[in-house]
From Swiss-Prot:
Family the UniProt entry places it in: Belongs to the peroxidase family. XPO subfamily.
Any one of the GO BP annotations: response to oxidative stress
Organism field: Drosophila melanogaster (Fruit fly)
Name of the molecule in the record: Peroxidase
Site (Transition state stabilizer): R331
């Protein structure tokens, strides 16, 4: 094996993304047609392409949608599920309701979305999996090499296999990256971890020394720092703190035996749980209970998220007078861009609630809250599936695999399948979606309405210090900046601010997000890169050279110097190094996982906004309006003083995507929500507008 010092020298040679020049001949046909596949829970997307969309016009269906041929037989959930939102380090599980009522609105904890299996997708449940976990002991121990030895240090792999060059993406803006974090936080949060700041469980001392096994907490899985680390060796850091995710074996869940399965404490659905919370108790803490509104606090003429009651605990604050927010998700304060979008989504709820109240003054608080929430979620799903996901998965891929449809504006897509498990896949949350950390930019520009750069912020200075967005005109300036500044290219480079300075507080260095991603892969016992390649219909590699179809020779040499065997390559690592599929922002292995996940997320959601159920759905006129929702409109309606935006806010400004007045950007006409039973002649000319 090559010495660690030599490997680190390789890391400094500046090899960047040779893989980006490779082309994948299979195009969007990610999965080969395998009717005899040994993976019964996989939907086989190349086969999906042969199925006709089930699109219905303005009348509701009189017969059920055709059965999805790729779903596994219905089976009861194998674990107990709970409803409480745990603090870091704890998880509380409870059984789902024995009986579900069919109501017009989602529950807050995700229960009863599937009426016959009410625990599917609920908060505090197990992640799903595509492949059996690969624990070292078959039960819960982190993954090891096929030789029985430990795998190479996650930090070493981060340094050698991944660069840190600044390569802006000419096509996509920082809002594209930031919306991805919104979706990530909405779908997944590992039990037992803060995931946004310094963890209370210490596996390393404050000066970076490893705590002995005899005194370390049982959940410790510290990342070993190589002795000649180009950053941490300057301050003598020997390890990076890492705490394992809690599983069904660690909690009071009804453990069913077999390998441990990690728990997620948020709902699996795209339901804006990060805005509304994952339980009645959590939601009650952030609701105003008047006019259907959520709590906001007014300062300096603007409306903000409510302040935390534990400022020094929730934020990296020196004293309790600093701005620190509370919301439906404890990670709200993690970075300025995230806090801005959570504020915008909260303001959007209240904007809708106020408009509905004016249109339907007979509505009580509960009806206004639920209707505003329902519309807010529908707009969010429209933006996510029809504006954001095509950038990542490719529009052609999504159409072929029935994630989106070219349907008439008022037509329903009745594709809900009660046999589809909507649970977030471990391979998705722990590996595939984390690849897009490469889009993070360490410099955040502040722009005027004329798009002149007024200044910039350094990301690591403002982790868990969100108060900067309330200073002066920073809220609008950062919002414009994120809509104008390019994100980092989706490649093998990770910005220095997250590779050496993550959550650094007042220290010279912080943690390394790419190292954390790799270590989490091993903590969760994810199947190897080679196993997942085969699962997704690619050729299994029988030697290092077998990876050459998707990974460039220089990168393969780096991997060979790191791993004892080609069978050891972590999924998070190998799939991140693949050449991208044309038209998408990922290689075929991650694209396979992402496509599978977002198919399940859509088809496994009874409340998905395009479904035409008479009780849970929208009218054809309302659905036609919801399809006008856009990221640009969301920003225009909920900034402080934003008056212009490009129509496609996830894409950089160009001749085909110019900055235009907000008044020219289509908006959802909320007058379509007038209760016709009581108000047949309301003059609605100004309702629903800013």
């Amino acid at each position: 094996m090559i010495r660690a010092r030599d490997l680190l020298l390789l890391a400094l040679l500046g090899f960047i993304s040779s893989a980006l020049g490779l082309k994948v001949s299979s195009g969007y046909h990610i999965v080969h047609n395998q009717p005899q596949s040994s993976f019964p829970n996989y939907h086989g997307f190349s086969y999906l392409q042969g199925s006709a969309p089930y699109v219905i016009g303005n009348s509701l269906p009189t017969s059920p949608a055709p059965q999805n041929p790729f779903s596994s037989p219905a089976s009861p959930p194998v674990s107990a599920y709970g409803y409480s939102f745990p603090t870091a380090g704890r998880v509380s599980c409870a059984a789902p309701p024995a009986v579900c009522e069919k109501t017009a609105y989602r529950t807050l904890d995700g229960s009863c979305n599937h009426l016959e299996q009410p625990g599917l997708g609920v908060a505090n449940s197990k992640y799903g999996r595509l492949l059996t976990p690969k624990y070292a002991d078959g039960i819960s121990a982190p993954t090891r090499s096929v030789t029985g030895d430990e795998l190479p240090s996650a930090r070493l792999v981060s340094l050698v296999a991944f660069g840190e060059q600044d390569v802006p993406d000419p096509e996509f803006t920082l809002h594209n990256m930031q919306w991805g974090q919104i979706m990530t936080h909405d779908m997944s949060m590992q039990a037992g971890g803060t995931q946004s700041k310094k963890h209370p469980t210490r596996c390393c001392t404050d000066d970076g020394r490893l705590i002995g096994l005899d005194t370390a907490h049982k959940t410790c899985f510290a990342i070993i720092v190589p002795p000649h680390d180009p950053a941490y060796s300057q301050v003598g850091t020997e390890c990076l703190n890492f705490v394992r995710t809690l599983t069904d074996r660690d909690s009071n869940c009804q453990y069913q035996g077999g390998p441990a399965e990690q728990l997620t404490v948020v709902t699996s659905y795209l339901d804006l749980s990060l805005v509304y919370g994952n339980s009645i108790q959590q939601n009650s803490d952030i609701r105003e209970f008047q006019g259907g509104r959520m709590i906001v606090e007014e300062r300096n003429g603007a409306k903000w998220l409510p302040l935390s009651r534990n400022v020094t605990g929730d934020c990296d604050a020196v004293d309790a007078s600093e701005v620190c927010y509370r919301s439906g998700d404890v990670r709200v304060n993690q970075n300025p861009g995230l806090a801005i979008l959570q504020t915008i989504l909260l303001r959007e709820h209240n904007r809708i609630a106020d408009a509905l109240s004016a249109l339907n003054p007979h509505y009580d608080d509960r009806t206004l809250f639920q209707e505003a929430r329902k519309i807010n979620i529908a707009q969010y799903q429209q933006i996510s599936y029809y504006e954001w996901l095509p950038i990542f998965l490719g529009g052609e891929n999504m159409l072929k695999n029935r994630l989106i449809y070219k349907a008439p504006s008022g037509s329903y897509i009745n594709d809900f399948d009660p046999n589809i498990d909507p649970s977030v896949l471990n391979e998705h949350a722990t590996a595939a979606f984390r690849y897009f950390h490469s889009q993070i930019e360490g410099r955040l520009d502040l722009l005027s309405e004329l798009r002149q750069v007024l200044g910039s912020l350094t990301l690591s200075d403002w982790f868990n210090r969100p108060g900067i967005i309330e200073v002066g005109d920073n809220f609008d300036s950062l919002t414009r900046g994120h809509a104008t500044q390019p994100e980092e290219l989706t490649d093998i480079n990770f910005d220095r601010q997250i590779k050496h300075f993550l959550f650094r507080r007042n220290m010279p260095f912080g943690s390394d997000l790419r190292s954390l991603d790799i270590q989490r892969n091993r903590d969760h016992g994810l199947a190897s890169y080679n196993d997942m390649r085969e699962f997704c219909g690619l050729r299994r590699a029988h030697s290092w050279e077998g990876y050459g179809d998707l990974i460039s020779p220089p990168i393969l040499e780096k991997l060979k110097s790191l791993y004892p065997s080609h069978e050891d390559v972590d999924l998070t690592v190998g799939a991140s190094l693949e050449a991208h599929v044309a038209g998408a922002l990922a290689g075929p292995t991650f694209l396979c996982i992402l496509t599978e996940q977002f198919y399940r997320t859509r088809v496994g959601d009874r409340f998905f906004f395009e479904n035409g159920d008479k009780l849970t759905g929208f009218t054809p006129d309302q659905l036609e309006e919801l399809r006008k929702a856009s990221m640009a409109r969301l920003l225009c309606d909920n900034g402080n003083h934003i008056s212009s935006m490009q129509p496609e806010a996830f894409r950089t400004v160009s001749h085909s995507n110019p900055i235009i007045p907000c008044s020219n950007i289509p908006q959802v006409d909320l007058t379509k929500w007038i209760d016709q039973k009581l108000y047949a002649t309301v003059d609605p000319s100004h309702y629903g507008k800013k």
